A protein has these predicted regions:
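Glycine/small-residue-rich phosphate/adenosyl-binding loop
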Residues: 37-119
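Small-aliphatic-rich amphipathic alpha-helix that forms the alpha element of a beta-alpha
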Residues: 22-27, 102-155
Length: 208
């Protein structure tokens, strides 16, 4: 898990069906509310569907640029932020080249979309971890949000009584996996109350 960082730069080597099938099977091992398993994982790999994915990615990029104040970095900018932004732009520019998976969850009248999404987010995480275990790279995207949701819904034929909580690109990484960069976990954990640090738990942690 500590090396399952988001991969945005992929080689041109296609993902074989055997490796992809292992990832999809692992996704089904995730918990599901009431074990209903009212989920669907749609693999997008045909040229026609990849073209739709590319269009959805282009729409998402316009929103991302505004939301994060992001622009294409200058060629001589060697900062970490510039490197990260280059990877983001490369992912969006090449969106039509990749195999990806669209995740859908059936709506229930008594449950909010957020609650329902909780029944498929674990499956998405399982796929990410299974991809990493096999050396694949993966990126959870926002391409099924914004205007891209309707594009993908129409292209795939997702019924109106299903929500689309997420979309993941998979591929062989260009480069290698590495450790994730995270703030100390102790900064995100509290004990009993919002404003109480969990220092006792932190002090008991075993550091490898």
């Amino acid at each position: 898990m500590s090396t399952a960082r988001t991969i945005r730069r992929f080689s041109t080597q296609p993902v074989d069906d055997v490796t992809l099938a292992r990832c999809l099977e692992a996704a089904t091992w995730a918990p599901s509310g009431a074990n209903a398993q009212e989920w669907r994982f749609v693999v997008l790999k045909s040229p026609e569907q990849r073209a739709v994915v590319a269009e959805a990615a282009a729409q998402a990029l316009k929103v991302i640029e505004v939301a994060y104040g992001m622009t294409r970095p200058a060629a001589d900018d060697l900062s970490r932020r510039a490197r990260d932004n280059r990877a983001t732009y490369e992912l969006h520019d090449r969106a039509g080249e990749f195999t990806s998976v669209l995740f859908a969850q059936k709506r229930l009248r008594m449950a909010s979309d957020m609650l329902l999404a909780g029944s498929i987010f674990p499956a998405m995480q399982n796929l990410l971890l299974a991809a990493r275990a096999q050396g694949l790279g993966a990126c959870l995207t926002s391409w099924a949000s914004y205007g891209g949701e309707q594009l993908l819904r129409t292209a795939v034929g997702v019924p109106d009584d299903w929500i689309i909580p997420g979309h993941i690109v998979v591929g062989w990484p260009k480069g290698r996996h590495g450790p994730v960069r995270r703030r100390p976990w102790q900064d995100a954990v509290n004990l009993d109350r919002w404003d109480e640090r969990a220092d006792d738990i932190a002090s008991a942690a075993v550091v490898d």
